[in-house]
């Protein structure tokens, strides 16, 4: 089993994700090979909360060119984690 801190890379804090915090939904960038159960277990272990469900989105790398060299940026994976109503909040996202 992977270390939970290898699965969850960083929180995504934008205006849109801060609006979702009121609905008990928290957004993280996760490892591209992590599945929903791994993300759920990692969030529960790191933050000590109860997770109700996990939604995951994949983003492909964008094409970039610098002079005559071209390539793609790294692909990413984003997870929106919904907490149960009786769970405590994650302090990282407090305003």
From Swiss-Prot:
Record keywords: Ribonucleoprotein, Ribosomal protein, RNA-binding, rRNA-binding
UniProt keyword DNA damage, yes or no: no
Matches recorded under InterPro entries: Nucleotide-bd_a/b_plait_sf, Ribosomal_uL23-like, Ribosomal_uL23/eL15/eS24_sf, Ribosomal_uL23_CS
GO cellular component, one term: ribosome
GO biological process: translation
Source species, domain of life: Bacteria
Gene Ontology MF annotations: rRNA binding; structural constituent of ribosome
Gene3D superfamilies for this protein: 3.30.70.330
Subunit structure, interactors included: Part of the 50S ribosomal subunit. Contacts protein L29, and trigger factor when it is bound to the ribosome.
Family of the protein in this entry: Belongs to the universal ribosomal protein uL23 family.
Function summary: One of the early assembly proteins it binds 23S rRNA. One of the proteins that surrounds the polypeptide exit tunnel on the outside of the ribosome. Forms the main docking site for trigger factor binding to the ribosome.
Protein name: Large ribosomal subunit protein uL23
Species: Geobacillus thermodenitrificans (strain NG80-2)
């Amino acid at each position: 089993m992977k270390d939970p801190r290898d699965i969850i890379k960083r929180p995504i804090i934008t205006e849109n994700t801060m609006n979702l915090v009121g609905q008990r939904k928290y957004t993280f960038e996760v490892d591209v090979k992590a599945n929903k159960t791994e993300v759920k277990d990692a969030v529960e272990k790191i933050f000590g909360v109860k997770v109700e469900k996990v939604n995951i989105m994949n983003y492909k790398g964008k094409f970039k060119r610098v002079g005559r060299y071209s390539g793609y940026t790294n692909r990413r994976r984003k997870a929106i984690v919904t907490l149960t109503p009786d769970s405590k909040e994650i302090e990282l996202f407090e305003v």
